[in-house]
Amino acid sequence: NNKISEFLANNEKQLLLNKEYNPTEYNGYTKFNKEKVYNMIIYLSDKTILKTKLLKEMFYADFLFYKENCKSITGLEYCKLPFGPVPDSFETILSYGDQEDIIDYKPVITPSKEYYEITSKKKFNKDLFTKEELEVLDKIKKYFKNYNAKEIVDYSHKEKAFIDTNKCE
């Protein structure tokens, strides 16, 4: 039933956006920060990006920042899925961003495949980030600039953390 699906989607969105995440090892000892999440998406999308590539770049930004500073940028938790590490509730995050006119999140269907594009609709607010956070975002964006979605997925599958983690953990 469509109404039930809609209710569940709205309920999940409210839980995600209103939850007070206590800093833990799973979120990089950082409270969930919705504004930083969406501004990270805006920055990394740089107009338009494929969903798969965006989700990997978000993972690498949070994890590189954690490696260098013992905390993440966004407070997102990540899990292992077949195409690599992704933020928990990423569909909710992207759908909400689309509903709130922060991003355009749409499928692109070709004769051979279907994929999703994210296009930023807002201006990046660099004031939300520290100098160190901005440096990491820039480093990730530059490093993966010429990677396509498949290449970044393959790259992420070689990570020790990905190999050692069970699916959906």
Which residues does each predicted region cover?
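Domain-edge interaction signal
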Residues: 3-169
